[in-house]
Amino acid sequence: MVKKFIDKLRGVERDVIQAPDEGDAPFYAVQAGEADFFEAAYSQRLPVMLKGPTGCGKTRFLEHMAHKLGRPLVTVSCHEDLTSSDLVGRFLLQGEETVWQDGPLTKAVKEGAICYLDEIVEARTDTTVVIHPLTDHRRQLPLDKKGQIIDAHEDFML
């Protein structure tokens, strides 16, 4: 199932998709119970925001936890030019048809991945507003361009 999910995500620009491999977890030295905190948040389907200076280990921690929980990790590098369409998806021309292509956030929501919005503070407010319904009790992603609302997979985590 994870391989099928990873295959669906191939070709997404600006994103890194990592499947949990069957070997050892990526090395991470737990400092102060953050792994237990993360697991508790995951079990309650609560979003987590990691804050710290560049190079302090946020990405490595998420790689470690995704492996430990057996979930794929979708990493989106946020920046000031990132649009909500870059996150949720867009309509594209394919031959003479117009087709919808899910963005990395939509794919993660549908398939139950852990989605890491790296450097989210760099993204514009009009882009980040799309994640608000995912961070509360609704756990939903509105796809305004399609007129749909996607309920998050039970294993999805932001």
Stretches with model-predicted labels:
Residues 1-158:
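AAA+ P-loop NTPase catalytic core and its hallmark functional loops
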